[in-house]
Amino acid sequence: MPHIVLLGDSIFDNAAYTGGGPDVVTQLRGQLPEDWRASLAAVDGAQAADVAAQVAGVDASATHLVLSVGGNDALLAAGLLDEPVYSSADALRLVAATVREFEARYRDAVAACLARRLPLVVCTIYHGNFPDADYRERAIVALTALNDVIVRTACAHGLDVIDLRAVCDLPQDYANPIEPSSIGGAKIARAVACVATGAGTPSARLFA
């Protein structure tokens, strides 16, 4: 029996933010064929460095892994968005240092998943729904650098990518500035089901 395990953070472990509505894993189960299973190993608040421990607890029956992590790593580095600098070069150095540290942690997370020798799908970090337009624009620029790490890592290993920036693209997809609502969760679940079962048609293809 095919068995999808969701790894990572509150993109999947979003029950606390749905106002009583279904969480992502519940909605995913409703999207899958009857003979498929879905389990939640993701933990709200998890960072890339926590993924290896999640993978270690994955049941032997798992046949597919889906990873969405990085948002909390980004939150920990959010202070750089307001860091005073003397030049654009200084600003870019701050971003580069953050990217370098995140890349090491993210590649380790993916390596831990790949060690299970199962099909793996990874997700980008979505833009969120920050109410302040100026902050939102700065956050998107910084997240682009982190998402580049995710896409390059996926390309290096021939992995499929779910671009959550395109999936959760409306205000109602969010329960707050950073967490998916049940509406957004349904869209995430649909994307996961389509990729895992092969039922979906990619909206774009990337060759590397």
Protein language model regions, located:
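Serine-esterase "nucleophile elbow" of acetyl-processing enzymes
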Residues: 1-46, 54-61
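Alpha-helical cap/lid subdomain in secreted, periplasmic
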Residues: 53-208
